[in-house]
Amino acid sequence: MPTQYTSPATIDAPGSRAIFVVGAGRSGTSTITRALQALGVELGDRLKAPTQKNPTGFFEDRDLLGIAKRVRSELGLRAESVALIDPQLWGSPALEVLTNEAEETIRRRFGRYPLWGFKYAQTLRMLPFWESVMARTGIKLAFVVAARNPLSVARSRNKLDPLRGLQEKTDLEWLVNVVPYFRRLAGYPFVVIEYDLLMEDPHAQLMRMAAALDIPLDAVNRRGIEEFAGEFLQPGMRHSRFSEADLDKHPRLNPLARDAYRWLRRLATDQISTDDEALWQDWLQLESRLAEKAPALRHVDYLEAEVRRNRGGAFSRLLTRLFSRR
């Protein structure tokens, strides 16, 4: 049995709220987190430094990011893994230790802030862990879901990693990061922000975000919005743009990713509300369709691990030749 844990005394802000930015990688989670900062959401003073992969910044707290990556490791996953998570793993003693550590870190680092945020692209995939952590802190939780056309996600990923950037592989990563636990968000305030719409009209999207998350706007926030729209956002931050019609034309796009994204797009454009009954009924079907692929997803992880272990080997060269023709 895990050791009984007592959290340290902290200066908790009354009515403290947290906003988690979630969504598959390459969907604009970093830009959306910077938008939250413009609205006055505290991100902490230990942010991960920009890199060539993301020169404008990740806006990820290093302490919580480190815990999240250890959770991923305890679940037997890598960044590129697509295997579905066995629900029994959420109750493991190792995750209990990390739950305690995450609670202590949040109380120590963010307990004094009335409104703070955290972003890690795989948070939604590990939502049961974070729900457990936040329930212990008593901090109210809300979400921003980053959405982006799966064709653009693959194009962006391909620039960083051609193997993960294959449309078929990117779609699988997108699905396992978004579909399994998205229905749990129905119990929280949340808003979906579409990356293309944010780039086109940042003022409107930040106003949507503020309204949905009950963030009051004052003179400071409004200046933050202007700085975000006029100084932070740059045309070069978006290298591709696909329409919704393109989803039906692309022969390699996974139909499950197409269908799930279309629901997110409807939420992002306010065609439906977050309590839309048809959304949640259909999403349950999406979960079932994805669950049926569990054996194949485990095998994909095995094959990709073999390819990465044998870079330059015969099998790796064969795959490279096959996919370079597509």
Which sequence ranges carry the predicted segments?
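Residues that form generic nucleotide/phosphate-binding pockets
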Residues: 67-70, 74, 101, 105-109, ...
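Short secondary-structure boundary/hinge segments and terminal tails
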Residues: 53-56, 152, 203, 227-230
